[in-house]
Structures are given as structure tokens and as C-alpha cells.
């Protein structure tokens, strides 16, 4: 009943999810780790938004903070998270629990640790279905389990529902995890590096499956990854994160063909497919800053070969490049010297 308050408007342009000025910190013996810093973005119904960046940039924390799946050491310091216009940050845990799985659902990195090794996959799927439809029993429940297994591409579900997770390959286990995530017909699916534990050929199959399900069910998806190749395969829009902040946001075409932030340039140049026959892969010098004590000004300045004096003094605002494209770099200020991007002026295929 609680989820009815979040019924989709039917308008494909309506903002299903809107995050504004979100900051999340972890409180540790070493100090306060500012994992997510003043992040804002939106997600439309049926859209795939990829959040990309290096390990430790805050992308997984951002993803888990929306359905309130962070550990006790984490705290939301500021910001709002609205679904269909209603702020969910003030909801109690009991109310949030009703929304998990039905409004939003999560697919985690490692399918083996996400599944119960002592239960058959059919029993685990049935348990997930009954959380959201407790009155569903017998043949109807069995039919729903088989339907979910078919949806994620598991052949011969009648035979395989009686198997245990260890009988399945990594790719098939991830399909089971995805089926469990879809059991409550969620409006938003969070996929936190869902292909990291899989080999390359299986990764491609799972990415294609995610895209196929999104198109079939109209599920909005937030896809967290450090793999730009995966982003190119599935994303409609891309948010590039660095040191707890979104530094560039745009359509996949904006980011791949017209990147504006020097960090995005570095990420794209490091892709083997874009090395243009050079004997050495491009690397970004230095290390990301500590988020216990973020530097003054632009956090990327010390690694940025195009850094201006102001980068070390003042944090750049988010500059608007077009209706769909935004980047936080002083190079976009009208007073900045003109820099020709080292990448992005041609189609990369």
C-alpha cells in the first residue's frame, strides 16, 4: 500500500528520482570521510544513468545512500532524495523497508555472496516474490518464479529452479540475483558494478540483458561502474565522479564525443580501444586526494596538467554546456584560456 504513493506519472520526461545537494560522510577513528559531497542529479522513468569513476570516488556510496543501505558509521549530512516529487529522506526504517524491492531494488557486485548457498535458487526467488506478494502461493507462485527465470534468460527453468547456487556459473548466478531484484517489479534498479566478478564474455551478456530488461519493463536503472566500455554499451546518460563529486554530467554521446572535464579526458584516453596504436596506455598521474581532508579548490587540480591558478584556490561551479551537458571545470569559464581537448572531437565507434 505504501508504494502506491509513488505510482509513475506516465510522463516519460518526468523526473522519477531527484537527488539534490546530497552529502554523505563516514565517521571513523581517523576522522570524517566525506564520501559524497554536494551531489545533485535526476533520473527519468525508463532511463539508464551510469555513474563512473575510479575506485573510492564515492559512486557505490552514492548508489547505496538512495535506498538507505549504508552501514551505521555513515550519515547523510545534507541534501534531499525525492521520488516522484516526495522526499524519502525523512521516512522511517519501516516505511523504507516497504519500498525496498518494490520502488527500488539492488543488484550487487558478487553474486555468490548475494545468494544463500543452502537454499535452491527457486526457493530464494519464491521468498523474494512473497515479500511483495504474501498472498501468492501454490501454482501462481511457481509460475511467477519460472517467469522471472525466463525473463533473465535462464533456460529450462523447470529443471533449474531445484538447483543450488554452486551448480551455476558466475554469469548464471548473476542472472538469479537480477531475477530476485526484479521480483517486486521495482521502478528503479541500482546495479552496483554487476559485472566486476565475471569474465569479459559473460560481462557483455549481462550488460545486454540489463539493457533488454530495461527496454522490456521500462525500469529506470542506475548503473555503477569503473568500466567505460560497459557505459558505452548500456547508458543513456553518464555522471563522472571524482573525489566524492560529480564533475561532468551528460548524455552518453556528450561524454564520449564531446567531453569537457580534464578528468573525463584522462578516463577516455586510458581506454585501450582509444589508444590509437600508441605503444603505451595513457595514465592519469598522481593519486586521488584523501576525503578525510579534501584539498582547497578543485580536488583534481594536483593531477590536472591543464590546471589554472584558480583551481588551487576556488572550487569550480557546474558550468552549463547545453541543456543536457554540464561540467565542473574552470576551463569553461569565459576568461579561461582556450584548450583543445586531447580526445573527443571524433566518433570513437
Task: Give the label of every model feature segment.
Residues 52-53:
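The feature captures the beta-strand-to-loop junction immediately N-terminal to the Walker
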Residues 68, 190, 194, 198-279:
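P-loop NTP-binding/switch modules centered on Walker-like glycine-rich loops
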Residues 75-87:
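Conserved ABC transporter NBD signature motif
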Residues 86-87, 139-159, 268-269:
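Conserved ABC ATPase "signature" region
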Residues 155-161, 249-349:
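Short catalytic/signature loops enriched in Gly
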Residues 183-187:
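A short, proline-enriched helix->beta-strand linker immediately N-terminal to the Walker B motif
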Amino acid at each position: 500500500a505504501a508504494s502506491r504513493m509513488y505510482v509513475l506519472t506516465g510522463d516519460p520526461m518526468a523526473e522519477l528520482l531527484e537527488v539534490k545537494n546530497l552529502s554523505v560522510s563516514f565517521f571513523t577513528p581517523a576522522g570524517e570521510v566525506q564520501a559524497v559531497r554536494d551531489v545533485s542529479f535526476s533520473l527519468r522513468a525508463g532511463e539508464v544513468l551510469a555513474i563512473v569513476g575510479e575506485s573510492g570516488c564515492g559512486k557505490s556510496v552514492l548508489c547505496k545512500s538512495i535506498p538507505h543501505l549504508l552501514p551505521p558509521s555513515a550519515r547523510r549530512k545534507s541534501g534531499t532524495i525525492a521520488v516522484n516529487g516526495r522526499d524519502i529522506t525523512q521516512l522511517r526504517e519501516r516505511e523504507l523497508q516497504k519500498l525496498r524491492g518494490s520502488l527500488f531494488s539492488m543488484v550487487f557486485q558478487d553474486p555468490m555472496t548475494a545468494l544463500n548457498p543452502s537454499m535452491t535458487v527457486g526457493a530464494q526467488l519464491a521468498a523474494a516474490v512473497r515479500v511483495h506478494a504474501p498472498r501468492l502461493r501454490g501454482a501462481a507462485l511457481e509460475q511467477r518464479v519460472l517467469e522471472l527465470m525466463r525473463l533473465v534468460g535462464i533456460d529450462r527453468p523447470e529443471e533449474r529452479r531445484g538447483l543450488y547456487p554452486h551448480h551455476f556459473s558466475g554469469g548464471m548466478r548473476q542472472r538469479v540475483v537480477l531475477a530476485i531484484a526484479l521480483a517486486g517489479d521495482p521502478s528503479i534498479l541500482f546495479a552496483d558494478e554487476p559485472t566486476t566478478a565475471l569474465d569479459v564474455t559473460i560481462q557483455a551478456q549481462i550488460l545486454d540483458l540489463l539493457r533488454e530488461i530495461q527496454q522490456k519493463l521500462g525500469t529506470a536503472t542506475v548503473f555503477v561502474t569503473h568500466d567505460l566500455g560497459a557505459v558505452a554499451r548500456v547508458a543513456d546518460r553518464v555522471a563522472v565522479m571524482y573525489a566524492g563529486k560529480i564533475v561532468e554530467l551528460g548524455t552518453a554521446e556528450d561524454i564520449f564525443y564531446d567531453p569537457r572535464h580534464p578528468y573525463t579526458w584522462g578516463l577516455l584516453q586510458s581506454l585501450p580501444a582509444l589508444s590509437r596504436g600508441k605503444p603505451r596506455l595513457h595514465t592519469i598521474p598522481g593519486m586521488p586526494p584523501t576525503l578525510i581532508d579534501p584539498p582547497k579548490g578543485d580536488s583534481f587540480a594536483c593531477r590536472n596538467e591543464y590546471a589554472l591558478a584558480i583551481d588551487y584556490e576556488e572550487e569550480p561551479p557546474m558550468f552549463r554546456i547545453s541543456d543536457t551537458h554540464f561540467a565542473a571545470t574552470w576551463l569553461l569559464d569565459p576568461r579561461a584560456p582556450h584548450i583543445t581537448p586531447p580526445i573527443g572531437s571524433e566518433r570513437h565507434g
